[in-house]
Regions:
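ABC ATP-binding cassette signature C-motif
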Residues: 1-263, 307, 313-555
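Alpha-helical coupling/stalk and coiled-coil linker elements that connect catalytic or binding modules
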Residues: 272-281, 295, 309-316, 322-325
Length: 555
């Protein structure tokens, strides 16, 4: 086997207006290496993967795989064949095996022909059996079902043209994994996966024989899969050997030599350090490694790196003792029961993390809490002081030609939030849009930057109960940390739909978990506490992902 499977020599990329997003990157990739790509939003991570996949060839320098290397690429918006159903798209990955199985049956039949050429048939039989054996073709059907369950795919016969963006990504990811290319390039593979599917993907990629290069901000994923971290910092590619925790330790040695540190960053890191030190003994070993996070950003140049040190969640009116009380709630769509007899109370000061498969009804619960939808039966009782601010998952309802400042401020110099007023440019800066960044057009923003604009817009309402639908999607690790700290300092309550287990471990006081057939668990504790309880109560199999089972309406 070649020493390197992929090489980059002095690779650079210029984007409008004449900005070097990548510059002078020279890297070689080992066979079987597992590499996590980290960097701030807009640092060029997706651009790097497009270059490696051969999609973007307008570059400086040279990027090339070893001759004959099979490279598989998952972009953020993958293409599917809409003339085929879900199964048809998945089977594209194993077309050679299916053809070999069909042809092998024909070869067996041809042996019985009076004029059969036994030598030619035996040779072809050997070639076909080699193809089948290489991909475990005799267990093909089981492999398809296991992968479909693990990634919670839609039904096999589902119309691909009607799938949501998340469903399309899961189908594309499943197809790519079944292809088993020698090199996988994955752009945010954990997006639109629930926590159990992410855990399955971790195990799959950890054991994968090929090379994996993955952009992800899932910090447990980076800890459990990556053997290398490739950090993109101001256009440069910096490789670090080790997983996420190891990267933090190594980076500490570089950063601690610098003396300057911003007050906001130190405050942020101290808060996370306190959380790390308070971890249960069962996670002590990992916690010790993660204490290096305290030093990670303490001395780097803030203006150059443009990190999000703080996010600002405007406080609403003072929240009373009664927040949200739900009793005997039921909700169905068609003949599918999404929520069956749900009862829970959100106590004052709680942060409820909501987990479960896509399509289980998590966003539906939010719409019922805001009154946008009505339950089939049951009661939702909100406290008299409750003011809900809802931040939905879909962030495309923005004017692409607006600047950041105009989109957030509605062209007003003053923003009124609750009982106080704030200068609109100062408000934008609290979401880390400072100086000329406020004049960026929405159409030119990265996914994480769009997310921050969306948060800034929706949080102007100044509610004291936040409903956050996948707020962690597309955020870099620095912004994730800032959001965690903002939630921990928020004086009200929050209910947060998220699949980010680190995020849920750090901020959640309660977990709401959507299970099969409309059943929902409500647990006091963070995600790791809940997962431990679930395994102890029901065994390891209960946390293995599978296609969601819906309860049917009784007639």
């Amino acid at each position: 086997m070649a020493q390197y499977v992929y090489s980059m020599h002095r690779v650079g990329k210029i984007v409008p207006p004449n900005r070097h997003i990548l510059k002078n990157i020279s890297l070689s990739f080992f066979p079987g290496a597992k590499i996590g790509v980290l960097g701030l939003n807009g640092a060029g991570k997706s651009t790097l993967l497009r270059i490696m996949a051969g999609v973007d060839t307008d570059i400086e320098g040279e990027a090339r795989p070893q001759p004959g290397l099979k490279v598989g690429y998952l972009p953020q918006e993958p293409q599917l064949d809409e003339s085929k159903d879900v199964r048809g798209n998945i089977e594209e990955a194993v077309a050679d095996v299916k053809h070999a199985l069909t042809r092998l049956d024909e070869v067996y039949a041809e042996y019985a022909a009076p004029d059969a050429d036994f030598d030619a048939l035996a040779k072809e039989q050997g070639e076909l059996e080699a193809i089948i054996q290489a991909k475990d073709g005799h267990n093909l059907e089981n492999a398809l079902e296991r992968a479909a369950d693990a990634l919670r795919l839609p039904p096999w016969d589902a119309d691909v043209s009607k799938l949501s963006g998340g469903e399309r990504r899961r189908v594309a990811l499943c197809r790519l994994l079944l292809e088993k290319p020698e090199m996988l390039l994955l752009d945010e593979p954990t997006n639109h996966l629930d926590a159990e599917s992410v855990a399955w993907l971790e195990r799959f990629l950890h054991d994968y024989e090929g090379t994996v290069v993955a952009i992800t901000h899932d910090r447990y994923f980076l800890d459990n899969v990556a053997g290398w971290i490739l950090e993109l910092d101001r256009g440069e590619g910096i490789p670090w050997e080790g997983n996420y925790s190891s990267w933090l330790e190594q980076k500490e040695n570089r950063l601690q030599q610098e003396e300057r540190a911003e007050t906001a960053r130190m405050k942020s890191m101290k808060q996370e350090l306190e959380w790390v030190r308070s971890n249960p003994k069962g996670r002590h070993a990992k916690s010790k490694a993660r204490m290096a996070r305290f030093e990670e950003l303490s001395t780097s140049d803030y203006q150059k790196r443009n990190e999000t040190n703080e996010l600002f969640i405007p406080p609403g009116e003072r929240l009373g003792d009664k927040v949200i009380e739900v009793s005997n709630l039921k909700k169905s769509y068609g003949d599918r029961v999404l929520i069956d007899d749900l009862s829970f109370k959100v106590p004052k000061g709680a942060i409820v993390g909501i987990v479960g498969p896509n399509g289980a009804g998590k966003s539906t619960l939010f719409r019922m809490l805001t009154g946008a939808e009505q339950p089939d039966s049951g009661n939702i009782d909100l406290g008299e002081t409750v003011q809900i601010a809802a931040v939905e998952q879909f962030r495309d309802h923005m004017n692409e030609n607006n600047t950041v400042w105009k989109e957030i401020s509605d062209d007003s110099d003053i923003i009124r939030i609750g009982n106080f007023e704030i200068n609109s440019r100062a408000y934008c800066s609290r979401f880390n849009f400072k100086g000329t960044d406020q004049q960026k057009f929405i159409k030119d923003l990265s996914g994480g930057e769009r997310n921050r604009v969306h948060l800034a817009k929706l949080l102007k309402a100044g509610g004291n109960v936040l409903l956050l639908d996948e707020p962690t999607n597309d955020l870099d690790v620095e912004t994730l940390r800032a959001l965690e700290n903002a939630l921990l300092e928020f004086p009200g309550c929050a209910m947060v739909i998220s699949h980010d287990r680190w995020f849920l471990d750090r901020v959640a006081t309660h977990i709401m978990d959507y299970r099969d057939e409309g059943n929902i668990n409500f647990f006091e504790g963070n995600y790791s506490d809940y997962e431990t309880w679930l395994k102890n109560e029901f065994g390891q199999d209960v946390v293995e992902p599978h296609r969601l089972k819906y309860k049917r309406m009784s007639k």
